[in-house]
Amino acid sequence: SVVCAAGNEGDGDYDDFEYSYPAAYVDVISVGAVNKKAVPAYFSNANLVIDCVAPGVDIISTFPNNTYASLSGTSMAAPHVTGTLALLKNWSDDVFQRELTADELYAQLIKFTKTLEYPRTIQGNGLVYLKPR
């Protein structure tokens, strides 16, 4: 599975679509951004190919010169989904005793989304959410 940031050209209008590539290509998991309260980020692209959203506002990340910075963008959200897919792949290998196909892994990812009270064009299937065991 290829995971891509949905893009930061959003204008806050969920009916005004912004497409960014490679996120808008078929078979790419397109990830939008939400803040810590699960509210879609104003800059996050809205369109018909968003697959899911993840935290992407005020994310502490590495920065040049061995420092850290608070960054915002769908590029901060996409790694959350990549990490979630890695955990699901590890888990599914144990549960199913075989390696899942990309489509099966995607279906497992979507099972771990929580639908938010916003249009599908800004959240796709919802917020990626894994409960700790």
Question: Residue spans of the language-model regions?
Answer:
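Substrate-binding/specificity loop regions of serine endopeptidase catalytic domains
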Residues: 1-51, 58-82
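Residue-level recognition of conserved structural "scaffold" positions that shape functional pockets
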Residues: 14, 80, 90, 131-133
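Hydrolase catalytic cores
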Residues: 56-123
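Caspase-like cysteine protease fold
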Residues: 119-133
